[in-house]
Protein backbone atom coordinates (compact mmCIF):
# COMPACT_ATOMS: atom_id res chain seq x y z
CA UNK A 1 0.00 0.00 0.00
CA UNK A 2 1.11 3.53 -0.70
CA UNK A 3 0.11 6.99 0.46
CA UNK A 4 -3.38 7.08 2.06
CA UNK A 5 -3.76 3.36 1.57
CA UNK A 6 -3.73 3.55 -2.21
CA UNK A 7 -2.23 0.53 -3.87
CA UNK A 8 1.07 1.16 -5.61
CA UNK A 9 1.81 -0.92 -8.71
CA UNK A 10 5.05 -2.84 -8.44
CA UNK A 11 7.76 -2.06 -5.93
CA UNK A 12 8.71 1.38 -7.25
CA UNK A 13 7.13 4.39 -5.52
CA UNK A 14 4.27 6.14 -7.32
CA UNK A 15 5.47 8.98 -9.52
CA UNK A 16 4.45 12.41 -8.40
CA UNK A 17 2.64 14.80 -10.71
CA UNK A 18 5.72 17.03 -10.71
CA UNK A 19 8.03 14.16 -11.67
CA UNK A 20 5.66 13.09 -14.45
CA UNK A 21 5.49 16.68 -15.70
CA UNK A 22 9.27 16.96 -15.63
CA UNK A 23 9.61 13.73 -17.60
CA UNK A 24 7.14 15.06 -20.18
CA UNK A 25 9.06 18.32 -20.47
CA UNK A 26 12.33 16.41 -20.89
CA UNK A 27 10.79 14.35 -23.69
CA UNK A 28 9.31 17.44 -25.38
CA UNK A 29 12.62 19.30 -25.12
CA UNK A 30 14.51 16.40 -26.71
CA UNK A 31 11.99 16.31 -29.57
CA UNK A 32 12.12 20.07 -30.18
CA UNK A 33 15.91 20.35 -30.03
CA UNK A 34 16.19 17.40 -32.43
CA UNK A 35 13.96 19.44 -34.76
CA UNK A 36 16.46 22.31 -34.65
CA UNK A 37 15.11 24.60 -31.92
CA UNK A 38 17.46 25.93 -29.26
CA UNK A 39 16.54 26.11 -25.57
CA UNK A 40 16.43 29.65 -24.19
CA UNK A 41 14.78 29.07 -20.81
CA UNK A 42 12.89 26.43 -18.90
CA UNK A 43 10.05 26.82 -16.38
CA UNK A 44 9.84 30.61 -16.54
CA UNK A 45 7.48 31.95 -13.87
CA UNK A 46 6.17 35.44 -13.35
CA UNK A 47 6.76 36.81 -9.88
CA UNK A 48 3.89 36.91 -7.41
CA UNK A 49 0.59 35.11 -7.28
CA UNK A 50 -1.84 34.76 -10.12
CA UNK A 51 0.78 34.98 -12.82
CA UNK A 52 1.74 32.36 -15.29
CA UNK A 53 4.39 29.83 -16.09
CA UNK A 54 5.94 28.78 -19.37
CA UNK A 55 7.30 25.25 -19.55
CA UNK A 56 9.83 25.82 -22.34
CA UNK A 57 11.07 28.87 -24.24
CA UNK A 58 12.99 28.02 -27.40
CA UNK A 59 14.28 29.82 -30.47
CA UNK A 60 13.77 28.77 -34.08
CA UNK A 61 16.66 29.09 -36.52
CA UNK A 62 14.94 32.17 -38.02
CA UNK A 63 14.94 33.90 -34.61
CA UNK A 64 11.29 33.28 -33.72
CA UNK A 65 10.83 32.86 -29.98
CA UNK A 66 8.62 29.87 -29.22
CA UNK A 67 6.70 29.60 -25.94
CA UNK A 68 5.80 25.95 -25.35
CA UNK A 69 3.18 24.42 -23.07
CA UNK A 70 3.78 20.72 -22.42
CA UNK A 71 0.88 18.49 -21.38
CA UNK A 72 1.24 14.82 -20.51
CA UNK A 73 -1.50 12.29 -19.93
CA UNK A 74 -1.39 8.55 -19.60
CA UNK A 75 -4.40 8.19 -21.90
CA UNK A 76 -6.72 10.29 -24.02
CA UNK A 77 -9.63 10.17 -21.56
CA UNK A 78 -11.30 13.41 -20.44
CA UNK A 79 -10.24 15.35 -23.53
CA UNK A 80 -6.67 14.09 -23.48
CA UNK A 81 -3.60 16.24 -23.00
CA UNK A 82 -4.86 19.02 -25.25
CA UNK A 83 -8.18 19.27 -23.45
CA UNK A 84 -6.47 20.71 -20.39
CA UNK A 85 -5.15 23.81 -22.20
CA UNK A 86 -8.26 25.93 -21.84
CA UNK A 87 -8.75 29.65 -22.39
CA UNK A 88 -7.75 30.56 -18.82
CA UNK A 89 -4.50 28.57 -19.12
CA UNK A 90 -3.77 30.21 -22.47
CA UNK A 91 -4.25 33.66 -20.89
CA UNK A 92 -1.81 32.84 -18.10
CA UNK A 93 0.78 31.65 -20.63
CA UNK A 94 0.33 34.79 -22.75
CA UNK A 95 0.64 36.95 -19.61
CA UNK A 96 3.88 35.19 -18.66
CA UNK A 97 5.21 35.62 -22.21
CA UNK A 98 4.41 39.34 -22.16
CA UNK A 99 6.22 39.63 -18.84
CA UNK A 100 9.19 37.68 -20.20
CA UNK A 101 9.38 39.93 -23.28
CA UNK A 102 9.74 43.06 -21.12
CA UNK A 103 13.45 42.25 -20.88
CA UNK A 104 13.84 42.51 -24.67
CA UNK A 105 14.52 46.00 -26.14
CA UNK A 106 12.99 44.83 -29.44
CA UNK A 107 10.96 41.63 -29.02
CA UNK A 108 11.44 39.05 -31.79
CA UNK A 109 8.57 37.34 -33.61
CA UNK A 110 6.83 34.94 -31.22
CA UNK A 111 4.67 31.84 -31.39
CA UNK A 112 2.74 29.74 -28.88
CA UNK A 113 3.13 25.99 -29.36
CA UNK A 114 1.93 22.97 -27.41
CA UNK A 115 3.47 19.54 -27.07
CA UNK A 116 0.88 16.93 -26.18
CA UNK A 117 2.03 13.60 -24.80
CA UNK A 118 -0.41 10.72 -24.35
CA UNK A 119 1.35 7.51 -23.41
CA UNK A 120 4.00 6.89 -26.08
CA UNK A 121 2.49 9.38 -28.54
CA UNK A 122 3.96 12.90 -28.83
CA UNK A 123 2.26 15.59 -30.91
CA UNK A 124 3.80 19.03 -31.55
CA UNK A 125 1.24 21.71 -32.36
CA UNK A 126 2.90 24.76 -33.90
CA UNK A 127 0.85 27.90 -33.36
CA UNK A 128 -1.48 26.10 -30.96
CA UNK A 129 -3.04 29.41 -29.88
CA UNK A 130 -2.61 33.16 -30.36
CA UNK A 131 -1.84 35.98 -27.95
CA UNK A 132 -5.04 37.81 -28.93
Swiss-Prot record:
GO terms for molecular function: nucleic acid binding. It holds the Pfam family UPF0102. It comes from the Bacteria. Coiled coil: none annotated. Disulfide bonds: none annotated. Residues 1-23 are annotated as: Disordered. InterPro entries: Restrct_endonuc-II-like (IPR011335), tRNA_endonuc-like_dom_sf (IPR011856), UPF0102_YraN-like (IPR003509). NCBIfam families: PRK12497.1-3, YraN family protein. Belongs to the UPF0102 family. HAMAP family: UPF0102. This is UPF0102 protein Ajs_0414. It comes from Acidovorax sp. (strain JS42).
Amino acid sequence: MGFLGKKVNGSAPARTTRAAGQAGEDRALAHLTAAGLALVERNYRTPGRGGGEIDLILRERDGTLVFVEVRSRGASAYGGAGGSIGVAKQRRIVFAAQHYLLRWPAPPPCRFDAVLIEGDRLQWLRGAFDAA
